[in-house]
Regions:
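Glycine-rich, flexible loop/turn motifs
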Residues: 12, 79, 88
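Signature of the SF2 helicase/ATPase Hel1-core->accessory helical subdomain module
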Residues: 49-50, 55-85, 110
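Short, hinge-like loop/turn segments at secondary-structure boundaries
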Residues: 1-4, 82-86
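An amphipathic, basic-hydrophobic helix/alpha-beta surface used to engage anionic
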Residues: 44-45, 61-64, 70, 104, ...
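Structural recognition of the conserved hydrophobic beta-strand(s) that form the central parallel beta-sheet
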Residues: 32-34, 63-70, 99, 106
Length: 149
């Protein structure tokens, strides 16, 4: 499977690697896979949010498969905050989700996800430790899973 080169930039002394929208538009594949629909782009990117990149791809006639976690959907935000005690800031408008032509639920047992986090398969070790101590607890993941179902 072909991978497009990322857009690499410096921001506040940190090297950031972002989805390269212009490369995707130039390549113009029939279908593209773009991770993390709710992601906030680096300042160097044309759009503030990744879902806006995806809207541009769709408007250019490119089909897109993407990923999103249930806690990133705007209308669910208050429920997620009341369950987890954490306000999720990376969110998409409901209309973006509602306009999807197809949605497929991909599920994993909460404990299995925690094990993947701890093994470094999702985030860096430091990020994973913070995540499992705060947001990604068995209780929170179980509640989010119930919301998704």
């Amino acid at each position: 499977m072909e991978c497009l080169p990322n857009l690499v930039s410096e921001y506040n002394g940190i090297t950031l690697s972002e989805f390269n929208l212009d490369a995707a538009l130039a390549r113009h594949p029939q279908l593209i896979l773009v991770d993390e629909l709710a992601h906030t782009n680096a300042p160097v990117c044309r759009h503030t949010k990744r879902y806006q990149d995806i809207e541009e791809l769709l408007n250019a006639g490119i089909d897109v498969y993407t990923t999103i976690n249930v806690q990133h959907i705007e209308s669910i935000n208050d429920t997620v905050a009341s369950i987890t005690g954490i306000m999720v800031h990376e969110r998409i408008p409901d209309s973006v989700f509602d306009n999807a032509s197809q949605v497929e639920l991909v599920d994993i047992e909460p404990q299995e996800l925690i094990e993947r986090l701890q093994a470094g398969k999702v985030y860096s070790p430091t990020q994973a430790e913070r995540a499992t101590e705060n947001f990604f607890t068995v209780e929170n993941l179980t509640a989010l899973r119930e919301i998704a179902l």
